[in-house]
Amino acid sequence: MANPKRRWSKARTGKRRSQWKLASPTLVSCPQCHVFKLPHRVCGECGYYDGKQVVKVEAK
């Protein structure tokens, strides 16, 4: 099996790892209840999607 010829420096390792980042989720406001939700998904608060009620949500 092949082995590394040289040790990678801390700078090289750090430069590579600097691109590892988490993307913050994109949130949009629901047009019905104005709660933030993920785009292209049914609103968890009111159950509406694309102007139609798709899911019946029980009152809390």
Swiss-Prot record:
Annotated keywords: Ribonucleoprotein, Ribosomal protein
Statement: the UniProt record of this protein carries the keyword rRNA-binding: no
Entry protein name: Large ribosomal subunit protein bL32
GO CC terms of this entry: large ribosomal subunit
Molecular function via GO: structural constituent of ribosome
A GO BP annotation: translation
Organism in which the protein naturally occurs: Ruminiclostridium cellulolyticum (strain ATCC 35319 / DSM 5812 / JCM 6584 / H10)
Family stated for the protein in its record: Belongs to the bacterial ribosomal protein bL32 family.
Cytoplasm listed as a keyword: no
Alphabetical list of InterPro entries matching this protein: Ribosomal_bL32, Ribosomal_bL32_bact, Ribosomal_zn-bd
One Pfam family per UniProt: Ribosomal_L32p
Disulfide bridge positions per record: none
